[in-house]
C-alpha cells in the first residue's frame, strides 16, 4: 500500500463516528435525532413530530405513514459534520414491531446510544435492543432524557442500569434540578456548571452560561436547595462510583451516562462533544478471511438495508451499503460475493433521510446509497481484490402470520412487484404454501404494525388494495438440512409446512407446545428459530 493511500485512509477513519439510537417508543428518539442534526448544522430549525404547532415534519420521519402517525417505522441514515468529524447517525424505528429493521441497522453501527425516559427508566424494547447490542459487543452511551419533566431520581436510574443490564455506569454530567426546576447540568470532567436558557420550543440551539465550580456566583445563580443537592450528589458519586474507563466502554461493559432534555436542547451539545471523544472509530470487521482492518487498501462493504420508493416520483430502489475497508470511488467496479458477478457502482449517493446528493468518494464508517436494480440482497458483500465475505444478517423468528390477497386481477403485476420489493427490503418476510392451488403469499412478521405498513405501502406506492386474513400460527421454525432432512422424517402432525422466499422449508405451529411436541417425537429433526444465513463462504 502506498504511503499516500495509507495516510488518507488513516485520516478518514480518525474523523469518522458511526452510531445508532436505541430506545422504547416515545422516549424522544426522533426529537434527539433532530437536535443532534441541529447542532451539526445539517438542519437550521428542528420540527418535533408530536408538536401541535405548525412546525415542519421531522427530518428523519419521511415516509407518508410515519408523518401521518408520528412514529418512526423504518430506519434512516442521517449524515452530518460536527467539529470536523463526519458523523453517520443510523436512526432506527422506535416502534417495537420493527426490531428486525433495527437489528439490521445495528449490524452497520460501531456504537449505540441508549435513550431512556427519566420518568420511566428501562422499558421492554430498550432491554431487548440492549441484548442485540450486547451480542454485537457495541459500546453503549446512555442519554437520560426529558429532565424538563418530573421523573425518577438520577441515582436510582444508574442503579437500575447496573442491576438489570449488568453495565457499570459513569455519569459524565449530572442534572441540576428536574421538571420546571431543571436548570442545567454539571460537567464532571471539566468541573463546570452549564446553566441553560430555554429557546423557542427548542427549535434553535440552546444558549448556556458556564460557571466554574468554585465561582462565588453559583449560590446566586442557583436556588439554595438545588446547590446543596448538587454538592451532596457529587460527593456520593465521587465516593462510590467507578472512574471512567474507556477500555471498558469500548468492550460494552461500562456506559457513560448523560442527562438532558432533547425537547429543550439542554445537554444535547455537551453529549455530542463527549461522544466524539469517547466513541469507537470504525474498526475491524470479521470476514471469511479473518479480521479486516478499516485501513485495508482494498474496498469492501456490505448491504444492511434495502428501501423501495424513497422518492415516489421516480419509483426507485436504494441499497444502503456500510463501507468497511478501503476507499469507495464513484463508477468503480466491484465483485459481488454472493453471485460472483462484477458490478459497476454508478451514481452513488450520500443519504440524508429522503434527500440525497451525489458523492465521489466514501471511507470506512460511511453509509452510501446505491441504485439497486434487483442486484443486491440484505447481507450481501461487495469487494475489490482478494475475495472476502462478511457475516450475513439473520432474520428474526416471526410470531404473526397472514395471507394477503389481491382482489383485483388487473392489478396482478403491481401486486407481485410490490410484494417482491417490500420482501427484498425486509419490510416483512414472505412465505408460500406448498399447495400449488394456494398462490396467495403468506406474510410473516414480528408485530402487527408490519402488516399495516405493507398494506399501506402497497396502496400508497403501488396502487394496490389488499385483503388481509390472519392465520392461527405463532411459531415458525426453519428445518436445518432443508427439504432432504424434512422428507426423511415422513409424515408429521400439528404443523403446517411452507416455504420461504429462498424455497427453504419452514414449519408453522399454533403454539410453542406443538413445536416442542414435534421435537420430542422427532429428535433427529433439527429446527432453528433463525433463518440460516446464506453465505458462499463460512466465516473462520
Swiss-Prot record:
Alphabetized UniProt keyword annotations: Cytoplasm, GTP-binding, Nucleotide-binding, Protein biosynthesis
Cited PANTHER family: PEPTIDE CHAIN RELEASE FACTOR RF3 (PTHR43556:SF2)
GO biological process: regulation of translational termination
Family to which this protein belongs: Belongs to the TRAFAC class translation factor GTPase superfamily. Classic translation factor GTPase family. PrfC subfamily.
UniProt organism field: Nostoc sp. (strain PCC 7120 / SAG 25.82 / UTEX 2576)
Keyword Cytoplasm: yes
Residues involved in GTP binding: 23-30, 91-95, 145-148
UniProt domain tr-type G: residue ranges: 14-283
Record carries keyword rRNA processing: no
Matching CDD domains: RF3 (cd04169), RF3_II (cd03689), RF3_III (cd16259)
Annotated GO CC locations: cytosol
The protein's role, per its UniProt record: Increases the formation of ribosomal termination complexes and stimulates activities of RF-1 and RF-2. It binds guanine nucleotides and has strong preference for UGA stop codons. It may interact directly with the ribosome. The stimulation of RF-1 and RF-2 is significantly reduced by GTP and GDP, but not by GMP.
Superkingdom field: Bacteria
MF term (GO), any: GTPase activity
Protein name: Peptide chain release factor 3
Subcellular location: Cytoplasm
Pfam families: EF-G_D2, GTP_EFTU, RF3_C
Amino acid at each position: 500500500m502506498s504511503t499516500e493511500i495509507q495516510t488518507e485512509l488513516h485520516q478518514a477513519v480518525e474523523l469518522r463516528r458511526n452510531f445508532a439510537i436505541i430506545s422504547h417508543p416515545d422516549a424522544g428518539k426522533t426529537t434527539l435525532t433532530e437536535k443532534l442534526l441541529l447542532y451539526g448544522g445539517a438542519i437550521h430549525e428542528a420540527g418535533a413530530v408530536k408538536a401541535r404547532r405548525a412546525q415542519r415534519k421531522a427530518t428523519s420521519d419521511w415516509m407518508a405513514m410515519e408523518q401521518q402517525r408520528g412514529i418512526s417505522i423504518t430506519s434512516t441514515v442521517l449524515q452530518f459534520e460536527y467539529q470536523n468529524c463526519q458523523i453517520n447517525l443510523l436512526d432506527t424505528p422506535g416502534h417495537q414491531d420493527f426490531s428486525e429493521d433495527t437489528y439490521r441497522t445495528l449490524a452497520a453501527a460501531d456504537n449505540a446510544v441508549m435513550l431512556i425516559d427519566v420518568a420511566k427508566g428501562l422499558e421492554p424494547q430498550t432491554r431487548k435492543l440492549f441484548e442485540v447490542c450486547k451480542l454485537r459487543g457495541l459500546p453503549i452511551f446512555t442519554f437520560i432524557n426529558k429532565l424538563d419533566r418530573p421523573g425518577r431520581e438520577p441515582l436510582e436510574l444508574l442503579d437500575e442500569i447496573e442491576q438489570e443490564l449488568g453495565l457499570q455506569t459513569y455519569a459524565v454530567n449530572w442534572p441540576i434540578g428536574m421538571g420546571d426546576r431543571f436548570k442545567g447540568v454539571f460537567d464532571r470532567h471539566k468541573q463546570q456548571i452549564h446553566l441553560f436558557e430555554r429557546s423557542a420550543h427548542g427549535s434553535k440551539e440552546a444558549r448556556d452560561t458556564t460557571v466554574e465550580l468554585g465561582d462565588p456566583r453559583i449560590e446566586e445563580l442557583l436556588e439554595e436547595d438545588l446547590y446543596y443537592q448538587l454538592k451532596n450528589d457529587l460527593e456520593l458519586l465521587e465516593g462510590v462510583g467507578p472512574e471512567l474507563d474507556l477500555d471498558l466502554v469500548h468492550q460494552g461493559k461500562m456506559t457513560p451516562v448523560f442527562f438532558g432534555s432533547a425537547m429543550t436542547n439542554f445537554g444535547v451539545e455537551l453529549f455530542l462533544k463527549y461522544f466524539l471523544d469517547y466513541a469507537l472509530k470504525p474498526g475491524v470487521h470479521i470476514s471469511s478471511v479473518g479480521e479486516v482492518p478499516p485501513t485495508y487498501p482494498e474496498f469492501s462493504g456490505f448491504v444492511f438495508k434495502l428501501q423501495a420508493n424513497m422518492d415516489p416520483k421516480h419509483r426507485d430502489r436504494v441499497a444502503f451499503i456500510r463501507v468497511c475497508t478501503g476507499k469507495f470511488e464513484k463508477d468503480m467496479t466491484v465483485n459481488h460475493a454472493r453471485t460472483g458477478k462484477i458490478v459497476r457502482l454508478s451514481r452513488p449517493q450520500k443519504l440524508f433521510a429522503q434527500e440525497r446528493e451525489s458523492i465521489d468518494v466514501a471511507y470506512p464508517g460511511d453509509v452510501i446509497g446505491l441504485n439497486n436494480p434487483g442486484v443486491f440482497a440484505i447481507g450481501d458483500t461487495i469487494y475489490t481484490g482478494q475475495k472476502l465475505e462478511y457475516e450475513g444478517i439473520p432474520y428474526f423468528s416471526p410470531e404473526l402470520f397472514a395471507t394477503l390477497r389481491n382482489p383485483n386481477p388487473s392489478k396482478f403485476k403491481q401486486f407481485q412487484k410490490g410484494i417482491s420489493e417490500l420482501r427484498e427490503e425486509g419490510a416483512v418476510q414472505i412465505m408460500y404454501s406448498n399447495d400449488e392451488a394456494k398462490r396467495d403469499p403468506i406474510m410473516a412478521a414480528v408485530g402487527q404494525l408490519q402488516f399495516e405498513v405493507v398494506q399501506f405501502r402497497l396502496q400508497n406506492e403501488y396502487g394496490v388494495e389488499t385483503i388481509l386474513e390472519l392465520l392461527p400460527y405463532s411459531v415458525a421454525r426453519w428445518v436445518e438440512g432443508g427439504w432432504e432432512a424434512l422428507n426423511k422424517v415422513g409424515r408429521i402432525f400439528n404443523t403446517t409446512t411452507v416455504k420461504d422466499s429462498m424455497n427453504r422449508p419452514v414449519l408453522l405451529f399454533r403454539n410453542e407446545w406443538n413445536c416442542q411436541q414435534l421435537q420430542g417425537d422427532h429428535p433427529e429433526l433439527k429446527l432453528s428459530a433463525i433463518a440460516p444465513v446464506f453465505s458462499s463462504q463460512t466465516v473462520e
